[in-house]
Amino acid sequence: RVFRISLIRAFPALLFYPIQQVKQVMLGANGVAAHMQPGSTFIDMTSLNPIASKEIAAELASHGIQMLDAPVSGGEPKAIDGTLSFMVGGEEEVFNTFKPVLLAMGSSAVRCGSIGAGNTTKLANQIIVAANIQAVAEALTLAQKAGVDPDLVFQAIKGGLAGSTVMNAKAPMMIEGNDKPGFKVDLHIKDLNNALDCAHTVGAPVPMTAEVQEILQWLHSNGKGQADHSAIAQYYEHLTGIKLGRDL
């Protein structure tokens, strides 16, 4: 969503567009930047490759427009109840000015560094979430193949070191066979593509990210692109011929 041009000339513009559209929307011939006054601030809440964030910020700066990259974590449930977590990149003074705007939509907003740092942090977040989901799916598959109820395994370990917010949210969905989307497979593919691109650019090894990305791509190819990313468990079900929690 973008506020009407008439409303953003002297105040922040907040953008939620998909990655491929951001540059055109912001920097095109009749883009938002052409209608923003110098001294305005653009807050980008999409999940971009941080390199793209830096390119956009540099172009906006040539028009006298400041920028924050401020992707979020928490998914649809936290967006609905206003408890999103913002990870922000940009100048500290600009961040401090607009932190109250972000906290009107979320429960936390942390400045992680200069432009691009917000999206770098978001990519790190998405790597951890994807790897965690894969680990939960793999572990529960092992348990059931070994003859142990995966729900009891979940109940036993969720309070220990292996427990996590991701496990608490996704293990019950896997066990129930519920893939109603909170965060879709296709969106996670997009984020991990950005993570892989960024990693290759900066020279960071990300073999685990590449592996889980292939699983997500398999789900997409098998008609599950709009399913919740907990559908990673269905990849393991396909390989083993079981249904978690239902073939005991």
Question: What name fits each language-model region?
Answer:
Residues 81-89, 103, 110, 114-146, ...:
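Active-site-proximal catalytic alpha-helix in oxidoreductases
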Residues 115, 119, 163-230, 236, ...:
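Interdomain hinge/lid region at the active-site interface
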Residues 103, 244-248:
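ATP-dependent carboxylate/acyl-activation modules
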Residues 48-126:
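Rossmann-fold dinucleotide-binding core
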Residues 3-67:
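Rossmann-fold NAD(P) dinucleotide-binding segment
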